[in-house]
Design a protein with these regions (language model features):
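Short beta-strand elements
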Residues: 126-130, 173, 182-190
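N-terminal beta-alpha lobe that positions the nucleotide/phosphoryl donor
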Residues: 1-170, 179
Length: 190
């Protein structure tokens, strides 16, 4: 678990966390937060016997209903992963942000292949907004599981990428915004 301001390694924190770190270190107004690293993702999966690069290659090689079934099984297994030790680290990081106990949180994907020059993955991974403190662990697992959706694998196939992506997760306090938005200069999927 790293503070957003210390997120500099793409392979460890993903594209979104790097972008947020750049904003924070350049003194733009962005909520402070932290990143649950790809290392935490990999260690948590491996501790449960889930070897992501092997499972990815299996799913990547399949198609149709066979792929859908394999991916569904992966998502179920990820949802059952034991994360109590990681949750304790997250709680410490949350307390370090000095937010009131009733704060709601944004739990956001930051995959290693997300928000890059040649790949967007816009809208393919999940985001959870207004998450209560004790629901962050479930949101984390759901974001990890969103790597294992058919639409993600299909996009990877179209990009000719055979490598299993890894997911970091950004956690930030929700803010009262007057407006928000995203602008695309090219189509986010094709």
């Amino acid at each position: 678990v790293l503070p957003l301001s210390q997120c500099t390694d793409l392979n460890l924190v993903g594209g979104k966390a790097i972008g947020l770190a750049r904003l924070i270190t350049a003194d733009f107004s962005a909520p402070q937060g932290f990143c649950i690293t790809t290392e935490a993702y990999t260690q948590s999966l491996h501790a449960s016997g889930f070897i992501e690069h092997e499972e990815w290659q299996k799913a990547y090689a399949l198609s149709g209903n066979e792929r859908a079934s394999a991916l569904a099984d992966c998502r179920i297994r990820i949802g059952r992963i034991e994360t109590s030790q990681l949750a304790a680290h997250c709680l410490t990081a949350l307390q370090g942000l000095h937010q009131p106990p009733n704060t709601r949180w944004a739990v956001r994907s930051s995959a290693t292949n997300e928000d890059m020059a040649h790949t967007s993955f816009a809208g393919l991974y999940r985001t959870h907004l207004c998450v209560a403190l004790f629901d962050i662990d479930a949101a984390l697992k759901d974001l990890w599981a969103s790597l294992w959706e058919e639409r993600v694998v299909s996009y990877q196939v179209r990009q000719s990428s055979h490598t299993a992506p890894r997911m970091a997760v950004v956690v930030q306090p929700m803010i009262e915004a007057q407006s928000a938005g995203v602008a695309y200069s090219i189509h986010p999927v094709t």
